[in-house]
Design a protein with these regions (language model features):
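N-terminal Rossmann-like FAD-binding beta1-loop-alpha1 element of flavoenzymes
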Residues: 4-34
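Conserved beta-strand segments of alpha/beta enzyme cores
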Residues: 31, 54, 79, 219-221
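Mobile amphipathic helical/loop "lid" adjacent to a hydrophobic cofactor/ligand pocket
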Residues: 66-70, 74, 79-179, 194-195, ...
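Helical element adjacent to the flavin cofactor pocket in flavoenzyme catalytic cores
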Residues: 185-233
């Protein structure tokens, strides 16, 4: 099927945002086409098969509590492989294990005895978890406008616990360890980690964009680079 000469909407890029937008427009009966210069859909969510192994490009993980993810995808069909909630923390001398006793009660003794932070720090994590889960997800954005670092200090966490647990953990989420990211995002992501699982599709992260793209069929054009955009045309 050739690229249409006329259409209501041209979406440039077949990553998750472009595909989700296309599905919404398709549901409303709007003519559209999705163009992407790559050889497959997915954007940054791509997987390769190498010598019988499926390798995701970069660090990839899905949080099953994402509301838009649940609206846009059939998670059961992805055969998600779920990680046990918790973390291993290197203290400089040994690995310490912190688990989620709310979902895995057997993790409670190990988490309490872990030489990471204080008992008060761990109680504050539990209280923060329960407070965030007791509210709708969007209320995470209603709090004060300050940095995540300031938020953690306002919550009463010790500097040692912030450095040992929150900086490495959130540094991987925010891609910055100074924790200058908005506290609203911290509250939202922390709630997502507490409310659902971290998981990966059994056949690679690319299965997610492929699944979202399936109903679009030939409306998605890969190997199609966009060279210019104007008010009247996309070429």
């Amino acid at each position: 099927m050739e690229i249409p000469q006329r259409t209501d909407v041209v979406i440039v890029g077949a990553g998750l945002s472009g595909l989700a937008c296309a599905r919404l427009l398709q549901a409303e009966g709007i003519d559209l086409v999705v163009l992407d210069s790559s050889d497959a859909v997915g954007g940054r969510m791509r997987s390769d098969q190498v010598e019988g192994f499926i390798l995701d490009r970069g660090f990839q993980v899905l949080l099953t509590a994402y509301e838009e993810l649940n609206r846009s995808a059939n998670l059961n069909a992805l055969d998600l492989q779920r990680f046990k909630p918790g973390s291993l923390i290197w203290t400089g001398k040994r690995l310490e294990r912190l688990g989620d006793p709310f979902r895995n009660p057997t993790a409670l003794p190990t988490s309490i005895l872990a030489r990471v932070g204080t008992i008060e720090d761990k109680l504050r994590v539990a209280l923060l978890r329960q407070r965030l889960l007791s509210r709708p997800a969007q209320m995470a954005f209603d709090g004060p406008d300050r940095t995540t670092e300031d938020e953690l200090r306002q919550e009463g966490f010790s500097e040692a616990f912030i450095d040992q647990f929150f900086r490495p953990f959130l540094g991987g989420v925010f891609l910055e360890r100074d924790l200058k990211t908005s506290a609203s995002l911290f509250r939202y992501y922390f709630r997502c980690f507490a409310a659902g699982d971290a998981a990966v599709p059994a056949f690679g992260i690319q299965r997610l964009p492929e699944q979202i793209a399936e109903p679009l069929g030939a409306l998605v054009k890969v190997n199609t680079a966009v060279r210019s955009i104007s008010n009247e045309a996309v070429t």
